[in-house]
A protein has these predicted regions:
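Positively charged, polar, low-complexity stretches
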Residues: 2-91
Length: 91
């Protein structure tokens, strides 16, 4: 059996967290985005994704839905990709 690399372990943990945020709407958006894109994220992008996972649910929901402006620390390419994914998410 092959040992997982550090980034593979981080990706697996991030996938688990993305699918189980505890806020159903975000579970669907983050979980589906993670399923589709997480395994291709490089380390700096994974850092950004993990930071997004640390944001409280209600706050993240407002950002993703465009209800409030996203702070500059979180307004990066990964967040833009997540929002673009949400815009194309089947309803």
């Amino acid at each position: 059996m092959t040992e997982l690399t550090d980034i593979e372990i981080r990706r697996k943990k991030a996938l688990f967290r993305a699918q189980r945020r505890g806020f159903r709407e975000l579970d669907l958006i983050f979980g589906a985005f993670a399923d589709a894109h997480l395994m291709t994220l490089e380390e700096p992008e994974l850092d950004h994704f993990e930071a997004l996972l640390s944001v409280p649910d209600w706050q993240m929901f407002d950002w993703v839905m465009g209800h409030v402006a996203v702070p500059s620390a979180y307004d990066h390419e990964v967040f833009a990709r997540l929002c673009a994914y949400r815009n194309n998410f089947p309803s």
